[in-house]
């Protein structure tokens, strides 16, 4: 379950930001997770609750914002949203695509007090 180690990284970022900006608690933490990031959201939610115990984010609500997969089509030169890495271009039907988005995971923002 790599979601546990992802949450440990999030905890480190939260603690660093709490020291830098002087907040005591995180009420809401919003994560953007790309379609191809390979993150199991249910496991991430469970790990988040466990790993955040004793930190500024203990008891925080985790909101996950889904980001679409995106690819550049070498046939038509356009960027398009794709559901699967192996889908053809939805604009021209071409099959020569390079994924350019959808594998990211980042903290979008936090509501703190």
UniProtKB/Swiss-Prot annotation:
Single GO term (MF): zinc ion binding
GO biological process terms on file: protein maturation; protein modification process
Keyword Lipoprotein: no
Highest taxon, organism lineage: Bacteria
Keywords: Metal-binding, Nickel, Zinc
PROSITE patterns the record matches: HYPA
Binding residues for Zn(2+): 73, 76, 89, 92
Keyword Metal-binding applies: yes
Pfam families: HypA (PF01155)
Family indicated by similarity: Belongs to the HypA/HybF family.
Cited function: Involved in the maturation of [NiFe] hydrogenases. Required for nickel insertion into the metal center of the hydrogenase.
Protein name listed in UniProt: Hydrogenase maturation factor HypA
The species this protein was found in: Cereibacter sphaeroides (strain KD131 / KCTC 12085)
């Amino acid at each position: 379950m790599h979601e546990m180690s992802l949450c440990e990284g999030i905890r480190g970022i939260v603690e660093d930001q709490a020291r830098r900006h002087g907040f005591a608690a995180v009420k809401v933490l919003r994560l953007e997770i790309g379609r191809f990031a390979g993150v199991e959201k249910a496991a991430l939610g469970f790990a988040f609750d466990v790993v955040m115990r004793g930190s500024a984010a203990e008891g925080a609500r985790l909101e996950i914002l889904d980001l679409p997969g995106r690819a550049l089509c070498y046939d038509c030169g356009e960027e398009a949203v794709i559901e699967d890495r192996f889908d053809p271009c939805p604009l021209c039907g071409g099959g020569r695509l390079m994924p350019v988005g959808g594998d990211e995971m980042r903290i979008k923002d936090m509501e703190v007090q």
